[in-house]
Amino acid sequence: MDFNLNDEQELFVAGIRELMASENWEAYFAECDRDSVYPERFVKALADMGIDSLLIPEEHGGLDAGFVTLAAVWMELGRLGAPTYVLYQLPGGFNTFLREGTQEQIDKIMAFRGTGKQMWNSAITEPGAGSDVGSLKTTYTRRNGKIYLNGSKCFITSSAYTPYIVVMARDGASPDKPVYTEWFVDMSKPGIKVTKLEKLGLRMDSCCEITFDDVELDEKDMFGREGNGFNRVKEEFDHERFLVALTNYGTAMCAFEDAARYANQRVQFGEAIGRFQLIQEKFAHMAIKLNSMKNMLYEAAWKADNGTITSGDAAMCKYFCANAAFEVVDSAMQVLGGVGIAGNHRISRFWRDLRVDRVSGGSDEMQILTLGRAVLKQYR
């Protein structure tokens, strides 16, 4: 197996390094994190590089560069301190619409290409339906040639700024035999109320509660086929979990390098703390976790490019990387000592972000259940 990046991948990675060195992005990220604001200027800079075209097929003007290239770019962005969690819709969001959307829906979403603006997100989670998606209560009901959406969603990412959301709802006309369908909803429609929620980490991407009170839709607003909602979101979940895992690795690598530089410079008892065996042990364990994450992610990316990735693979990446990355950042914070927990060091942001990732995008427990079933299924 060749672990070297090809020329195209090297070019992308070099471009990322150049962009990250072009200005003091960390000050901008710290400000956006503090104020819970989407870093649109940074995302626009990435879009100008073509990052939002990485997975778009060539026939639609994209680069069709594949998941291995995406992994290389994501890892480098994270290693250099970028909040890649704000980019989850950037590589795959267009493709979702190219596969499932009507031409009108595709045109609306593709208009955001290259802008850096948030364009859409899925609204699935509800107050009474988190991991148990099947218990959702939001309904769509047909009356007089129109569709009416009623219910509430919670913890919906990006929804404070995005102009469109894809809402999962059940057919109100068949409560005993639920039909789950998705709807493409313009957030400016009457009857929609958005309440922004505060959260511990991932603060540059909004998290909101959304209520729908007789929101009027048309049949043309259906996203995909009626009754196919669950099948589509399963694919979206796998894609999201892989991207979350990539983000986890990059963030952990950045914290590791920050701590390593500090350990070689910080002098106590007459020598650099990096010469103490207890500190060296921490770095040995961190390096093992980082290398394991990297190899797992590149294997998953290769499988994605070759059409063999499974939900079990995505769950494994999400669970292992979320936990290993949090452990790395926690150890790095311990090495930094007071510097890490006081003042404005970015590691405190990393720590908060990674703790949230063990819940968002699918909890640790759900990943274990998914993976356990997938493993045993291979031996039936």
From Swiss-Prot:
GO CC annotation: cytoplasm
Signal peptide: none
Induction statement: Transcribed during anaerobic growth in the presence of L-carnitine or crotonobetaine.
Activity relative to temperature: Optimum temperature is 40-45 degrees Celsius.
InterPro entries found in the cross-reference section: Acyl-CoA_DH_CS, Acyl-CoA_Oxase/DH_mid-dom, Acyl-CoA_Oxase/DH_mid-dom_sf, AcylCo_DH-like_C, AcylCo_DH/oxidase_C, AcylCoA_DH/ox_N, AcylCoA_DH/ox_N_sf, AcylCoA_DH/oxidase_NM_dom_sf
Pathway as given in its UniProt record: Amine and polyamine metabolism; carnitine metabolism
Record keywords: Cytoplasm, FAD, Flavoprotein, Oxidoreductase
Cofactor(s) the protein requires to work: FAD
One Gene Ontology MF term: acyl-CoA dehydrogenase activity
Disruption phenotype: Deletion of the gene abolishes gamma-butyrobetaine formation and increases L-carnitine production under anaerobic and aerobic conditions.
GO biological-process terms attached to the record: carnitine metabolic process; fatty acid beta-oxidation using acyl-CoA dehydrogenase
Subcellular location as annotated: Cytoplasm
Cofactor note: Binds 1 FAD per subunit.
pH dependence of this protein's activity: Optimum pH is 7.8.
Entry similarity comment: Belongs to the acyl-CoA dehydrogenase family.
Matches recorded under HAMAP family: CaiA
Self-association and partners: Homotetramer.
Protein name per Swiss-Prot or TrEMBL: Crotonobetainyl-CoA reductase
